[in-house]
Amino acid sequence: MTTSTDRLSVTVAENKQPYFVEWADSFGPKIAGVKIIFWSFFFGAIGLFYRAIKSLNSRERMLSTLAFTLFLTSIIFSRYSGNSTFNGTNGLSLLFYALGPIVLLATLGYYYRLHYKSGEQERLKNIEFSSIFVLCFFLISLISARGGIRLVMMLVPAASILAAYLSVEIASLALNTEKSTKRTISIICAGIIIVAFIFSGYQFYKTSVATAAGYIPSPYNQQWQKAMAWVRESTPPNAVFGHWWDYGYWVQTLGERATVLDGGNAKSYWNHLMGRYALTGTSNKEALEFLYAHNTTHFLIDSTDIGKYSAFSSIGSDKNYDRVSFFATFNQDLSQIQERKNSTVFLYSGGVLLDADIIYEDNGTRIFLPEGTAALGALLIEKSSTTGEMISQPVGIFVNQDRQYNLPLRYAFDGELKDFGSGIESGVFFIPRLINGANGLQIQDDGSLLYLSSRAVNSQFARLYFYNEVNPNFELVHSEDDFFVAEIKKQVPSFNSSIISYDALRGPIKIWEIHYPSDIEFKKEYLSEEWPPELLRV
């Protein structure tokens, strides 16, 4: 089963429908491979159900509890993992998922009818309402957690109640048991569970402390705080910011300025328009017309948008996914440097499937590399041995059906955009890389590069953020360096790049002030809030 099937939802990580092996880890820790909290609330729910129906006879209680156990198991384990028999989408998984509630409802319905026909339905009124309420709360929370990662937190209160109930019930059983053997066993079980809970709490504490420490400093309390301080102090109070939706609340709260998009996705179709025209489009005019319709005064791009390009290019595509693309990272392989008479050839290794077909004529031979099947495996960059500048076009090493094709790329950016006038409509963008050398961390100039396919190489995003295009309509008014990049610049004054590759791509927050041409037209269609049906579904 899938819960999020529209373009926007499937690109939001929190909306992903989790597998059991993913969300169950939130209810650890493990002792000898056993998830303590998970199994505590699992058996706690079964125990509470058994207690709730104590007005029934032994046989009825036992069979009803078994039906409830099957019901609980079907909800949890019918979506176990992506590579298991129960992956949540195949026929067997769906059958098992449906079997649980069917068996439970059939069992309870059968006993209700039995008591009704015998005139004993009054016994059913003795079922504990409070227990049923807790179980309903738990089941709603459990189904919600199964439906989306962001809803796993809803399971925490109910799971905590049931885990605590299990320990209290076992402790109560130990205290009220007269037989010494049962009493001893119950006390031992209760002790083990209580100690396990204490251990779990301590492990959660350690994990939380370590996680919190890893987030300090973070982009939110360093780079974004500083960038938004500039926004508050240097832009008018009625300024309106355009950017990808992820940062809407940050700009609104930290920068105290209005935004076109926000984290709540109240008008999600505008995400499509922002992605299509302002970020992935190649027309400066269309980008301005969209932003003008929303009274946008400033435009913002954050370095994390580099990794999100695949998301907003998907959301911004037409029904044929004409904009879908990504920025693939390739790293320089120091073991495969080729020295020539007056130049050096560097190999950048990586690997990515093509996002669009490539058709290229080479000496009268037509080369066809299909999207999704052919791949780019590496890139060759030739530089002068004396000046260090590129002296020839980048060459992509493409592979299709066990055949290799070395094809030239038309564009390259190494301080400035170079258009070689021929080659496939793709390019590379060089980035310094921080590596662990013999003497500690070392900066490797042009140690990494991004491959920009034909769909992305001339996009608004690439031209503004990567190439620093001088655009009369988009004036760069502020650039806030990543915390790590800022520290490098302090220690290495000669370092002049705003982007570096270290664990991830670290770059600036760039803000442009928009200057609209006098003849720009207002287009009402950019204010539409309704998704065309053909664009909504994946």
Regions found by a protein language model. Give the residues of each.
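Short linear interaction motifs
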Residues: 124, 134-139, 280-282
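Hydrophobic alpha-helical transmembrane segments
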Residues: 47-54, 140-148
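Extracytoplasmic
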Residues: 177-538
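Membrane-interface junctions at the ends of membrane-embedded or membrane-associated helices
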Residues: 49-58, 107-123, 160-188
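Hydrophobic/aromatic-rich transmembrane helices and adjacent perimembrane loops
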Residues: 90-103, 144-178, 184-187
